[in-house]
């Protein structure tokens, strides 16, 4: 996972509240067995509307999504985060997030910043005035900025640290690799242990 300290790019206004994970990515796409290639499934039902932002050239390559309250609610599916990232989003700002979605985002390298509803309206107004507006989401300073506009956001310290360091669950575990190895070597031989993968298993 790549470290994130700052995200700068085109911002998209998603003027919807209560956007659940099924609206982010419908269930039929969950059968895929890879963690990439979900950009075509993002907001699949809504993108059938030619006026939806995904179909607007001005928002091509967008990296920041500004949504209404209660974004990412509903069932737990990491695919929702994968779809947003595969499309190109690196940060989402909203007054409230589904707890599980927010947790999944921090583990997958998607910055989720909590802003007030008034500040969301300010951001939307700026984006309406200048479609394709570039927005900078600064994780170090915890502020989103555009010319003449500065909006603070909240993010818990643990998730902020993981994003700044670029630590997914595997990388977080590997920070303690020496301690884990020492513990394994000190266990009795008859106890269950983690063994290196055999070459044949790696080939499969």
From Swiss-Prot:
Heterodimer of LeuC and LeuD. Coiled coil: none annotated. One of its GO terms (cellular component) is 3-isopropylmalate dehydratase complex. Keywords: Amino-acid biosynthesis, Branched-chain amino acid biosynthesis, Leucine biosynthesis, Lyase. The gene is leuD. It is an enzyme of class 4 (lyase). This is 3-isopropylmalate dehydratase small subunit. SUPFAM superfamilies: LeuD/IlvD-like. It comes from Clavibacter sepedonicus (Clavibacter michiganensis subsp. sepedonicus). Its EC number is 4.2.1.33. InterPro entries: 3-IsopropMal_deHydase_ssu, Aconitase/3IPM_dehydase_swvl, AconitaseA/IPMdHydase_ssu_swvl, IPMI_Swivel, LeuD. Catalyzes the isomerization between 2-isopropylmalate and 3-isopropylmalate, via the formation of 2-isopropylmaleate. Belongs to the LeuD family. LeuD type 1 subfamily. Pathway: Amino-acid biosynthesis; L-leucine biosynthesis; L-leucine from 3-methyl-2-oxobutanoate: step 2/4. It comes from the Bacteria. It catalyses: (2R,3S)-3-isopropylmalate = (2S)-2-isopropylmalate. GO terms for biological process: L-leucine biosynthetic process. Pfam families: Aconitase_C. GO terms for molecular function: 3-isopropylmalate dehydratase activity. The keyword Transferase does not apply.
